Amino acid sequence: MRESHRAPWLAVGVVCFGAFMGQLDASIVTITFPAMERDFGVPVAAVQWVSLIYLLGLIALLAPAGRLGDAVGRKLVYTYGFAVFTVASAACGLAPSLGALVVLRLAQAVGAAMLQANSVALVTTSAPKQRMRFALGVQAGAQSIGLALGPTLGGLLTATIGWRAVYWVNVPVGVAAIVAGRYLLPRTRQFSRPERFDWPGTLLLVAWTSALLLVLSAASGLNLPAWTTALLAALALAGLAAFIRREVTTRHPLIPVWLLRSAPLARGLAGAACGYLVLFGPLVLIPQLLGHDLGSEARTGLLLSALPLGFGLAALFGDVVLPRAWTDSQRGFAGAALTCAVMGASVFMPVTVQTVVPQLALAGLGLGLFVPANNTVIMRSTADSSASLLGGLVSMARGIGTTLGISLMALALHLGGVSHGYAGSTQARPAFIVLAVAAATAAAIALAGRTQARGPAGRPREADPSGGFS
């Protein structure tokens, strides 16, 4: 079957299982917070760690999981990652206490990191070169479907069965994906001795990213003493400096320095962070603006689905609608510019259901054009042998963007004068300004990439629409 002309697309379909589940899990959990507060008898400040620990573990482990995939085989790491994720999901649904749930969420993050770090690499090495952009769009579409279903499905499951069902829903999909991956994913193992793994670099990465995320959470309203926040900020800076020094001096770095010296890669990773900041920011912002008017979590989730649905449509069909002669940078610029225009206009418009739905849909369309094109530029910036590591870096950038989107929206609402409760149109302006600036940054990054195809010899060039190199 692997030799059939359909085999690459069957492999892409298997990877879409992981893309779907990853984004479903990202958007479904937060809606269960009130139910968990009642069940465990704890405040929301404690329940927030259910999401925070998952995000910390995911960002810290993505690069190691990508390197592991390059060393021992992407199919092996991806399949075992799904197994870990599925078992941990079932265990989360049986957690007897909040502490146990937090620990199990960290185990779930281990499996998710193994999935996400290798998913983009499996797509790019499975799909035909001339169809890579379309394949990445299909994967992005699967992500958007998971993201769109999360809030509504989570609210429905919590109301009818209970919050534990939110974790159990991962189990049947996970089992199906493990079986499909065993037979449909291509073998990528390179029977060579893997390099020594950079465990000190991994620990430093865990330290500074964890401290940074805690600082961002504190800036967004988490009740931490000032001295604790200052100490965490100092730890984040010191950890980052030590991590950079380690990666520059060690013989076997976790993140090879030559990768980060690539201008297309550096721009692409920054673009990925900006794109996911704009994608996840409204998921925090809009419930604060319209949650009271809509009256239920299910209705709020249904309204929010306009953003990921627009994202999915553009990711799947943008390759057909846009001119075939356009480069990835041109496609990315068009999408980011559309999103920037929408967010910029939102600064001056009243926030109502009638205005927010088309705004979210248009912003989603723009992001659906930008993200696959940006991913293609990143994955073509180096050789296939580093594809899993690149995939891990892309997922790490997405995680950072997601975290920034959540934290900066809370901070912007605070700066707008919202201490608790719901915000009005005027109070939301700082948040929309943040989203517009992030989208404008993504557009500038894509515009800068247009010169790459005319770059000097020896540098990676952007792929043309036919799949070759221009």
List PLM regions with ranges:
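Hydrophobic transmembrane-helix bundles of small-molecule transporters
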Residues: A159-G271, V278, L302, L435-A436, ...
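Transmembrane-helix bundle of Major Facilitator Superfamily
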Residues: M1-Y183, V347
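Short helix-kink/termination motifs in transmembrane helices of multi-pass secondary transporters
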Residues: M21-T32, G57, R74, V166, ...
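12-transmembrane solute porter fold
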Residues: P8-I31, V44, S119, P200, ...
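Interfacial helix-cap and linker-helix signal at transmembrane-aqueous boundaries
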Residues: M36-E37, L68-G69, L153-I161, L216, ...
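A residue-level signal for alpha-helical anchor/packing sites in multi-pass solute transporters
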Residues: L122, S126, L156, L184, ...
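Intrinsic disorder in cytosolic terminal tails and internal cytosolic loops
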Residues: M1-A7, F191, A448-S470
